[in-house]
C-alpha cells in the first residue's frame, strides 16, 4: 500500500454512523481528495494514510485509504492549529495561542498528565476545562484504539464499527473473544471475525472459534429459507467453514447448545438443529396459533346471512356459496385462512368481511407485508392498510440484531379483527412478532396464495398453517375476475395444476418464441422501445414491468436494468446522475431497496409522518441527486421519502427489471418475462406461476416454448425445512 501524509483542510462528506468520509488533504501544498472511513474529522489534523490511488469516473483521481493515523503536532504552529481545530470545545485560536505560549512543546504532555494547569490560562474556567478534557479524553481513547487495531492489520472501516460498539474497551474485548462481534455488530459475519481472530493469534481449534463456526453454519438457515438443519448437514457445513475434524465440530455443537445459541430437537427420530432465534420464533408461533385457533365468536347465522345479503345489494354482485362461506367463517372464528389464485375473488371477500365486521361495530385493521401490497389493499378497499412493520410500530434499536416493535405482548394492538393480505410473504420471525401483538379475543384473517413462492425470510408459514389443519381453510378455486378475452387467470390456474395452457397469442397472454438469450434480450428491449408504445393505453414507463427468473446473464436483471434504463430514462442535461461502482443512478430511475435497513429515516411527503426502516423489496423513484450534499432522495410508491448518502447506494438496485422473488406482493398492468433453461430446483412451476400472477392486463412470455412446458412440468421446487406443522401438532395434542 502507498502512504500519503498531509493536513485535513476540508470535509466534503462525513457519515457519523459508519465513518465514511470524503475530504481534501493538503499534501505539500497540493489538494488531494481522500476517501475512506474515519472515526472523527477535525480540520487542521495532520494525518498519515495507507491505501491506493484510484480514478473515479466523475470525481477524478482520489486516494482511497484503508488505514489512517492521526499525527500529533510537533511544532508550536501545529499545536495551535490542532487545539483550535474544533477538537476541544471552548478553545479558539486566541486561547490556543495562549496555551502554547505558556507551555510550548510540553502542551500535549500537560494535557495528558497535569491538565488542571490549564486553569492558569486566562479565559479557561473549571467548566470549560471539564468539557475540554472530556473531548480530549475521547480523542485520546480513539487514537489509542485505532493505533492498536492497525497494529493487528484491522482496516479503518472495521475499526470504526468496532470502536462504535465497544469504545475504549475495544481491544480488551477482542482479545478475550473476537468472535463476539458476530453477535454484537450488525452486518459482521464469521469470515470477518475469523480473519480478525487470526491476526490476534487465536488458535484454529479454540472453543470460541468452533462455536462461532457452528452458529454461522446454522445462520445459513436464514438465507436458505429453512428454520433448522439436519445433523449431517450441520456437521458437514461447520467442518467446511472451520477446517477441523468431525469430533471437534460435534463437541462444538454440544457447547453451542449449552451456551443457548442453538437448540436441538427430534422430528420423526431425526436430530435437527435450530439457531436459537428461529427455534423461539417457530415454537412461539405454534403455541400462539394454537391458542388463537381455539377462539370462537358467537354470531347468529341469520344475522350474518342478512349482513351478507346487504353487502351483495351494496356491491350489486351475487356471491356464491364459496364466498359466503368464507365471510361467515371469518366472522365466527379466531383464526381463518383464505387462499386462492388471481381472479378468484379474494378482494371481494376481504371487502365483505370488512363491511360486515364494521357493521357489527368492530374495529378492523387491514395490513400487508410490503408497502406495495398495503397500497394496493388500500386502493381496493377504500380503507387504510398498513405494512406490518408500521402497524407493529417498528423502531430502530442499535443493540438489537432483529427488528424491535413497540407493539407486543405488553402493548398489544387494540383491535377486534386484523385482515392480512399476501400472507404467503410473511416469514416465521415476523409472524411471531405479529402474534405477540394480538390480544386475546382478536380475529386474525390471513389471505394469500399458498401456491406462490414462499417468503424471502425463513419459514413457509402460510403453507405450513394450511397443512397443519389448525384453522378453517377456505380454498377459492372459481375464477371471477375474467373478461371474455382474458386468459391470464385461466392460464395461471392451469399452470398451477400442472397443465400446459393453450396459447393463441390473440388474447392478453402471449408467448413470443425466441431460440436463444440474444433473441430474448432483443425482443424484450424492442417491446419496451417501440412495440408496446403502439398499444393503446399502455404507458411503458409506469405500466410495464420486466420480471426475470435470474439476476445474472444476458437476460438477468442486472444486465437488463442497464439497457432498459437507457431506453426508458436516458441521460439528459436536465437530470442529475451519480456513478456508484458500475451503476449509474439517474433522476427518474425506478429503484428498489435490496436489503432491510431498520435504521434508515423516512418522511411521508403528504402527512409529514416520520419513522425508521426501509425494507427489502420497497420500490420507488429517484427524486433528486445532490453532488454537493453527496446524497440521493428516493420517493417510494407508498408516499415515504428517504435520503441515501452516496456511500449507502449499495442498498439500492434498479427496478426496471426485477426477479420473480422481488416481484411478490405486487401487480403490474403488463408483465414481460424471459424464459430460459436451467435447473428445475429453481426454474419450476411455482416460480412461473408466481411470475404469471403478477400481470393484470397483459402477460408476455419471451423464449423457447419447450422451456415454458418444462417449467410447468417441473414440480421440483425444494421444500423448506420447517418444523411448524410438527410443533402445532405437539401443542394441539397437549391441549386435548
Describe the predicted segments one by one.
Residues 1-303:
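Accessory, non-ATPase domains that flank or precede helicase/AAA+ motor cores in DNA-metabolism machines
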Residues 616-736:
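C-terminal accessory regions
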Residues 306-334:
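Conserved pre-motif I regulatory segment
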Residues 324-327, 332-506:
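ASCE P-loop NTPase helicase motor core
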Residues 11, 49, 593, 622-625, ...:
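A generic structural signal for residues embedded in beta-strands
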Residues 52-57, 594-600, 676-679:
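Short, charged beta-turn/beta-strand-edge "cap" motif at the junction between a beta-strand
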Residues 450-612:
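Conserved helicase motor core of P-loop NTPases
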Amino acid at each position: 500500500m502507498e502512504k500519503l501524509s498531509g493536513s485535513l483542510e476540508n470535509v466534503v462528506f462525513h457519515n457519523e454512523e459508519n465513518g465514511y468520509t470524503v475530504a481534501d488533504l493538503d499534501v505539500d501544498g497540493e489538494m488531494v481528495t481522500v476517501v475512506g472511513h474515519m472515526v472523527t474529522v477535525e480540520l487542521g489534523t495532520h494525518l498519515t494514510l495507507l491505501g491506493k490511488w484510484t480514478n473515479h469516473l466523475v470525481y477524478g483521481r482520489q486516494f482511497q485509504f484503508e488505514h489512517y493515523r492521526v499525527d500529533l503536532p510537533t511544532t508550536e504552529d501545529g499545536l495551535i492549529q490542532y487545539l483550535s481545530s474544533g477538537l476541544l470545545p471552548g478553545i479558539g485560536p486566541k486561547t490556543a495561542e495562549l496555551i502554547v505560549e505558556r507551555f510550548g512543546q510540553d502542551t500535549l504532555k500537560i494535557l495528558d498528565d497535569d491538565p488542571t494547569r490549564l486553569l492558569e490560562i486566562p479565559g479557561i474556567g473549571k467548566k470549560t476545562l471539564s468539557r475540554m478534557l472530556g473531548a480530549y479524553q475521547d480523542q485520546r481513547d480513539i487514537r489509542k484504539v485505532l493505533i492498536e487495531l492497525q497494529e493487528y492489520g484491522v482496516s479503518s472501516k472495521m475499526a470504526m464499527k468496532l470502536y462504535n460498539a465497544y469504545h475504549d474497551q475495544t481491544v480488551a474485548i477482542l482479545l478475550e473473544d473476537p468472535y463476539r462481534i458476530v453477535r454484537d455488530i450488525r452486518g459482521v459475519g464469521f469470515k470477518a471475525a475469523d480473519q480478525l481472530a487470526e491476526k490476534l493469534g487465536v488458535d484454529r481449534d479454540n472453543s470460541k472459534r468452533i462455536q462461532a463456526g457452528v452458529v454461522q453454519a446454522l445462520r445459513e438457515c436464514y438465507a436458505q429459507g429453512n428454520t433448522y438443519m439436519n445433523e449431517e448437514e450441520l456437521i458437514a457445513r461447520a467442518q467446511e467453514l472451520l477446517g477441523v475434524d468431525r469430533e471437534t465440530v460435534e463437541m462444538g455443537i454440544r457447547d453451542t447448545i449449552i451456551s443457548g445459541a442453538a437448540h436441538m430437537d427430534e422430528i420423526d427420530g431425526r436430530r435437527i438443529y435450530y439457531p436459537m432465534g428461529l427455534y423461539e420464533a417457530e415454537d412461539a408461533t405454534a403455541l400462539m396459533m394454537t391458542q388463537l385457533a381455539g377462539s370462537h365468536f358467537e354470531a347468529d347465522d341469520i344475522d350474518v346471512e342478512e349482513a351478507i345479503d346487504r353487502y351483495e345489494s351494496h356491491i350489486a354482485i351475487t356471491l356464491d356459496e364459496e364466498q359466503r362461506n368464507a365471510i361467515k367463517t371469518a366472522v365466527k372464528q379466531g383464526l381463518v385462512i383464505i387462499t386462492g389464485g388471481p381472479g378468484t375473488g379474494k378482494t371481494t371477500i376481504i371487502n365483505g368481511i370488512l363491511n360486515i365486521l364494521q357493521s357489527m361495530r368492530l374495529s378492523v385493521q387491514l395490513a400487508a407485508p410490503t408497502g406495495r401490497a398495503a397500497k394496493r389493499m388500500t386502493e381496493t378497499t377504500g380503507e387504510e392498510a398498513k405494512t406490518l412493520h408500521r402497524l407493529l410500530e417498528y423502531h430502530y434499536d442499535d443493540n438489537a440484531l432483529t427488528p424491535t416493535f413497540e407493539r407486543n405482548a405488553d402493548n398489544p394492538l387494540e383491535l377486534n379483527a386484523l385482515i392480512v393480505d399476501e400472507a404467503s410473504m410473511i416469514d416465521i420471525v415476523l409472524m411471531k412478532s405479529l402474534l405477540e401483538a394480538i390480544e386475546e379475543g382478536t380475529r386474525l384473517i390471513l389471505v394469500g396464495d399458498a401456491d406462490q413462492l414462499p417468503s424471502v425470510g425463513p419459514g413457509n408459514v402460510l403453507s405450513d398453517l394450511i397443512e397443519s389443519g389448525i384453522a378453517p381453510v377456505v380454498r377459492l378455486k372459481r375464477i371471477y375476475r375474467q373478461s371474455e378475452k382474458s386468459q391470464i387467470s385461466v392460464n395461471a390456474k392451469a399452470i398451477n395444476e400442472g397443465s400446459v395452457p393453450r396459447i393463441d397469442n390473440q388474447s392478453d397472454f402471449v408467448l413470443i418464441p425466441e431460440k436463444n438469450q440474444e433473441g430474448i434480450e432483443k425482443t424484450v428491449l424492442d417491446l419496451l422501445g417501440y412495440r408496446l408504445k403502439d398499444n393503446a393505453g399502455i404507458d411503458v414507463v409506469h405500466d410495464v414491468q420486466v420480471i426475470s427468473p435470474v439476476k445474472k446473464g444476458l437476460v438477468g436483471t442486472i444486465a437488463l436494468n442497464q439497457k432498459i434504463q437507457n431506453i426508458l430514462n436516458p441521460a439528459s442535461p436536465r437530470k442529475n446522475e451519480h456513478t456508484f461502482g458500475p451503476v449509474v443512478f439517474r433522476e427518474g430511475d425506478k429503484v428498489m431497496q435490496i436489503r432491510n435497513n431498520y435504521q434508515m429515516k423516512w418522511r411521508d411527503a403528504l402527512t409529514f409522518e416520520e419513522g425508521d426502516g426501509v425494507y427489502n423489496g420497497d420500490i420507488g423513484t429517484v427524486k433528486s441527486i445532490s453532488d454537493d450534499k453527496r446524497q440521493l432522495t428516493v420517493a417510494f410508491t407508498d408516499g415515504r421519502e428517504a435520503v441515501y448518502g452516496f456511500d449507502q447506494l449499495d442498498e439500492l438496485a434498479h427496478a426496471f427489471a426485477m426477479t420473480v422473488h422481488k416481484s411478490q406482493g405486487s401487480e403490474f398492468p403488463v408483465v414481460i418475462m424471459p424464459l430460459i433453461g436451467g435447473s428445475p430446483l429453481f426454474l419450476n412451476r411455482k416460480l412461473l406461476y408466481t411470475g404469471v400472477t403478477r400481470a393484470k392486463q397483459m402477460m408476455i412470455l419471451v423464449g423457447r416454448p419447450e422451456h415454458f412446458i418444462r417449467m410447468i412440468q417441473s414440480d421440483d421446487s425444494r421444500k423448506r425445512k420447517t418444523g411448524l406443522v410438527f410443533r402445532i401438532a405437539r401443542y394441539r395434542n397437549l391441549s386435548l
